[in-house]
C-alpha cells in the first residue's frame, strides 16, 4: 500500500514520515497514463512544477502590480533562481506554485474583506499541505506574520465589526470547519 512504501522495509507507515506530494500526484499520473516510464514521468513532473511555479507567481504578481515586466522578473526569480536550481536533489521544495496565489488572496481578503478570498486562502493553504507539509507550515507562518504586519501598519480597527455580524461568523466557522475536514486525511494515514 502507499503508506507502507518499501524503501524503509520492514518499517510501516513510512510515507507519513515526510512530504508525500499528494497534491502533485495528478500531474505525475497524467504523464504515467500517457505512457511515460517512471523516470520520464518524473522529469516531466519536475518540468511542470517549474512551469507552474512561474505561471502562478506571474498571475499573482501581475494581479497585484499590473506590471508585466516586473511580474515576469519576480516570477522568474521565484521559479528559476539559483536557490531552486541548487535544490534539484530535494524535489519536495518545488511544489510551491500555490503559495503566491495564497498570499495574493490573503491580501485581497485583508484589504477588501470579501469572504471568498478567505475561502480561496484556506483552500490554497490546504492544497499546499497536500503538495508539501513543510512548505505549508512555512506558508502558514508567512500568513501569520503577514496578518500581524497588516494590522500593525494599517491599524484597521474596523475589522472588529466583521466579527459582530453573525452571518460572517457562520461563514468563517464553516470555512474553518471545511478546512479541518479536508486536512484530516493527512493527519490519519
Name each model feature, range by range:
Residues 1-53, 76-96:
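Membrane-interface coil-to-helix junctions
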Residues 22, 36, 115-119, 158-161:
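Juxtamembrane loop-helix boundary motifs flanking transmembrane segments in multi-pass membrane proteins
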Residues 2, 8, 129, 164-167:
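Intrinsic low-complexity, intrinsically disordered segments enriched in polar/basic residues
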Residues 1, 184-189:
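Short, intrinsically disordered, charge-balanced linker/junction segments flanking boundaries
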Residues 45-64, 69-153, 172-179, 185-186:
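Membrane-embedded helix bundles of polyisoprenyl
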Residues 1, 112-113, 155-158:
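Short loop/turn hinge sites at secondary-structure boundaries
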Amino acid at each position: 500500500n502507499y503508506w507502507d512504501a518499501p524503501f524503509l522495509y520492514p518499517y510501516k507507515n513510512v510515507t507519513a514520515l515526510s512530504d508525500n506530494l499528494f497534491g502533485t500526484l495528478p500531474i505525475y499520473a497524467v504523464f504515467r497514463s500517457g505512457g511515460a516510464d517512471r523516470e520520464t514521468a518524473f522529469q516531466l513532473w519536475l518540468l511542470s512544477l517549474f512551469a507552474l511555479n512561474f505561471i502562478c507567481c506571474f498571475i499573482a504578481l501581475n494581479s497585484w502590480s499590473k506590471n508585466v515586466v516586473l511580474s515576469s522578473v519576480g516570477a522568474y526569480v521565484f521559479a528559476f533562481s539559483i536557490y531552486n536550481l541548487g535544490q534539484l536533489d530535494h524535489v519536495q521544495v518545488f511544489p510551491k506554485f500555490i503559495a503566491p496565489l495564497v498570499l495574493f488572496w490573503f491580501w485581497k481578503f485583508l484589504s477588501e474583506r470579501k469572504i471568498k478570498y478567505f475561502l480561496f486562502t484556506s483552500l490554497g493553504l490546504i492544497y499546499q499541505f497536500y503538495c508539501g507539509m513543510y512548505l505549508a507550515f512555512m506558508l502558514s507562518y508567512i500568513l501569520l506574520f503577514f496578518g500581524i504586519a497588516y494590522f500593525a501598519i494599517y491599524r484597521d480597527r474596523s475589522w472588529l465589526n466583521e466579527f459582530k455580524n453573525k452571518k460572517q461568523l457562520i461563514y468563517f466557522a464553516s470555512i474553518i470547519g471545511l478546512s479541518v475536514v479536508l486536512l484530516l486525511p493527512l493527519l490519519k494515514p
